[in-house]
């Protein structure tokens, strides 16, 4: 039985593992955390239909139970390529072998504290979109002082489309995440005022535009085109922001009870050593380079090493699931062709 090692037990890794196992392969998922699910564990509800994240995660976990070796709290320390495939050295002096390797290590969230002018980690009432999502999960939406926020601002593209931050790419999901979160806030705090400060709004997915219109028409959420220049904390712990309204070409000051920073996706650096060992190439933006972004998007430059999900760039969960299902066919074809090649090389033995 051909074996496959999947590094990363998030959405992409779990879905790929399930499908590969159903195809009859021996699958090992290597996850460095104490539970699978990746960033989905941090989320409350998903756009655009606000389906509970826990529901999607439970489905992925249940399917992945079938015939899969799940190694939690496990880290790959070294990989070596050999004639049969790959030898993976793990922490605690463990070793496994595999005929193919699938990189599913996902992304990292931008560290908002690097944008000091925004005040995250400095001012108590400046939070990130992830912090807000976890507050939704707990059912407690309050300021640091325990008050219900009545005036809330969202800043788009924090750590995305920002060359100074080293991330010139668009994170793809921040705009719709902000809209979804703003609507949920408005439903929980009907008398609140909510302001969205953006560079450009990119509602590319199905039903995204409808959700954006709902935010404006039904919930009266205000969208202001402009970039935050600075945030200050007032004596009462409210946050004052300075923004330039780029449509009106006017500076703007506003006091807020809560400021939410929509943090973007950036490449994960947790497997840099592995990539170096295998000589897997990265793109200029730091995400893994696809062998052919149109025809073979899951292949890397190294035969037998595949990549799936947000390790190759920002994606929605739906796109990640589709990517994971597609890569299973790529891996199956690779292993089938490898077996066929060995048979052809040895055909003289049967003549």
Outline where the language-model segments fall.
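Residues forming the flavin
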Residues: 1-351
């Amino acid at each position: 039985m051909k074996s496959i090692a999947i590094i990363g037990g998030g959405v992409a890794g779990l879905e790929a593992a399930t499908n590969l196992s159903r195809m009859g392969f021996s699958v090992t998922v290597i996850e460095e955390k104490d539970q699978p699910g990746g960033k989905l564990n941090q989320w409350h509800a998903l756009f655009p239909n606000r389906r509970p994240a826990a529901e999607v995660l439970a489905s992925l976990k249940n399917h992945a139970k079938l015939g899969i070796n799940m190694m939690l709290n496990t880290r790959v320390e070294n990989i070596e390529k050999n004639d049969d495939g790959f030898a993976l050295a793990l922490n605690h002096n463990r070793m496994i072998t595999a005929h193919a390797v699938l990189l599913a290590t996902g992304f990292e969230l931008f560290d908002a504290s690097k944008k000091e002018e925004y005040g995250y980690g400095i001012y108590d009432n400046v939070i990130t979109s992830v912090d807000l999502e976890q507050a939704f999960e707990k059912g407690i939406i309050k300021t640091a002082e325990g008050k219900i926020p009545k005036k809330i601002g969202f800043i788009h593209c924090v750590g995305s489309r920002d060359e100074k931050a080293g991330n010139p790419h668009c994170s793809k999901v921040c705009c719709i995440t902000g809209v979804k979160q703003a609507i949920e806030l408005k439903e929980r705090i009907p008398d609140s005022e909510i302001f969205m400060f953006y560079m450009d709004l990119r509602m590319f997915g199905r039903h995204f535009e409808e959700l954006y219109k709902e935010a404006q028409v039904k919930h009266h959420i205000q969208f202001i085109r402009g970039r935050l220049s600075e945030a200050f904390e007032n004596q009462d712990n409210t946050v004052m922001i300075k923004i330039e309204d780029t449509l009106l070409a006017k500076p703007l000051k506003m006091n807020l009870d809560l400021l939410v920073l929509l943090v973007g996706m950036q490449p994960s650096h947790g497997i840099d050593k592995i990539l170096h060992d295998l000589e897997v190439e990265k793109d200029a933006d730091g995400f893994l380079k696809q062998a052919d972004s149109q025809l073979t998007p899951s292949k890397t430059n190294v035969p037998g090493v595949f990549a799936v999900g947000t390790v190759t760039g920002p994606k929605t969960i739906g796109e990640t699931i589709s990517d994971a299902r597609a890569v299973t066919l790529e891996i199956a074809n690779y292993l089938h062709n490898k077996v066929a090649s060995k048979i052809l090389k040895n055909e003289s033995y049967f003549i």
